[in-house]
Amino acid sequence: MSAITLEQAVGKLRDLPTLPLVVTELISSFERTDISVGELAAKVSNDQALTAKTLRLANSSFYGLQCKVRTIDQAIAVLGLDSVRALVTSAGIIGSFNGGAGAFDFAGFWRHAVGTALCAKSLARLARCNQEYAFVSGLLHDIGRLVLITRFPTQYEAVIAHRNSVDCDMLQAERAVLGLDHAMVGRALAEHWKFPVLIQHAIGHHHAPMAQDLGAIPSVVHVADAIVHALDLAGHADERVPAIAQDAWNSLGIDPAGLRRVFEDTESEFDNACQILTASN
């Protein structure tokens, strides 16, 4: 089986499903300060499916609001632009990739992604990192795997076969068979979609945070990924739990009581958030 170059993988990004226009506009607004909240609210409201998902999640126990919000404008006023932007972006991306042919477990993939997003947000709150960047980075940390499985299906079947035959994790199997891994491809996709550099970096280094990542979003996502694998929220009993780098864990400064809260928050919100974000309409 021939290897895949990063250039070949990047060349396939143009063939991916087109994101809703409002989602691409929201992505481009992540680091802008001159954003028109009213204009963006109007654009989101024009997409009925995204609006419905966003309002359902905003009104769920995930945010614990005392009063029900009925419009995107109200959601922004109550939750803030960053939270609503993260919700709409997440719902839009999942909607664009939700489902596919073959043996790949798309439902399980998104269950793990949503769980990691929730866990990353909870960890970020305790580590005093940007919670919405953590949520989006957690949701998209394995997005490169979708590029590989949908654009190179035959090669990825060989990856799965290799993992099963030598009993290694998927990252090792990808590198052995393809010569690259989903983290590299995911970072390229995040760059292609013009996400902030911090999110690109978190996706690209979620398996191996670098020194400059300590105490920051990449370390948050690295730890969240391992926790959610350990909780087996995707329902993959044979999936290996990735090791947590000790320096990444230490850099977050989370005590045992805080860790218990992270576990509780992730598990308590998971089913509801997963049902809303992965709904077909």
Regions found by a protein language model. Give the residues of each.
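Short helix/strand-capping connector loops at secondary-structure junctions
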Residues: 242-258
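Conserved alpha-helical "signature site"
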Residues: 1-246, 268, 280
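C-terminal accessory extensions/subdomains outside the catalytic/core fold
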Residues: 252, 258-261, 266-278
